Amino acid sequence: MRDLKTYLSVAPVLSTLWFVSLAGLLIEINRLFPDALTFPFF
């Protein structure tokens, strides 16, 4: 039961960190390449 409580307290923290870093990455990509339908480095 203690392991389940530990998992339930760690999973929201990790998912929040993941979504915040993903959102920051997408924001920076859109800042460097605004309105990019095709990326020039491919």
From Swiss-Prot:
InterPro entries: PSI_PsaJ, PSI_PsaJ_sf. It comes from the Eukaryota. It is found in: Plastid, Chloroplast thylakoid membrane. GO terms for biological process: photosynthesis. GO terms for cellular component: chloroplast thylakoid membrane; photosystem I. May help in the organization of the PsaE and PsaF subunits. Belongs to the PsaJ family. This is Photosystem I reaction center subunit IX. It comes from Capsella bursa-pastoris (Shepherd's purse).
